[in-house]
């Protein structure tokens, strides 16, 4: 669980503050937690993300952002919805949410995506990401998930944009993080069978956690890093 929430933070810090290393992200932790609270996340989720980042960066309770319980109570609506739900409904935008969780595209990439960006390479479908890509880095994303859904949706759009508008309330960063975690799990080999050179060993508080380097690299490429 901590890994998932830390991935959310790292993806956000890379895209908004252009961090180049994990350590560079530490100074943005409190900004992230304050933003997450204002987005209307539950007290439980904010606390969970706080604990995850405190562990990741060895941050003391004196340094970490203190959640504003009164503010959080005020933003909860009587029927249990969050304030951000006024502006965005996953149910009403289920195709967008499903697409994001299956492709990991950035907001700017989604805004520029057209039906004709669905291509074939050696008989296999890919999404060609060229417009809106960060740093102008072109990449082709294989359809690892929801292949029929994505092909059907994009093919139906022709030269038109796949999504006319990306709502501001859509939490694209979290969908990217979900995609990253999902793709890593799909690609990762049995860690016990890998030679030392193909393993990534975490340090400090995450010491003991070990990941498949090859799978991590493929996920990074798919995300456009």
Language-model features and meaning:
Residues 1-72:
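N-terminal core-binding DNA-recognition domain of tyrosine recombinases/integrases
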Residues 41, 63-90, 134-145, 158:
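DNA breakage-rejoining catalytic core of tyrosine-based enzymes
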Residues 45, 49, 92-93, 172, ...:
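Hydrophobic (often cysteine-bearing) scaffold residues that line and stabilize catalytic clefts
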Residues 77-107, 210-216:
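Basic, Lys/Arg- and aromatic-enriched nucleic-acid-binding interface segment
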Residues 79, 112-149:
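Conserved tyrosine-mediated DNA breakage-rejoining catalytic core shared by Y-recombinases
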Residues 108-113, 219:
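Alpha-helix N-cap/helix-start motif at helix boundaries, enriched for small hydrophobics
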Residues 133-179:
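C-terminal catalytic core of Y-nucleophile DNA break-rejoin enzymes
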Residues 166-216, 225:
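Short basic/aromatic active-site micro-motif
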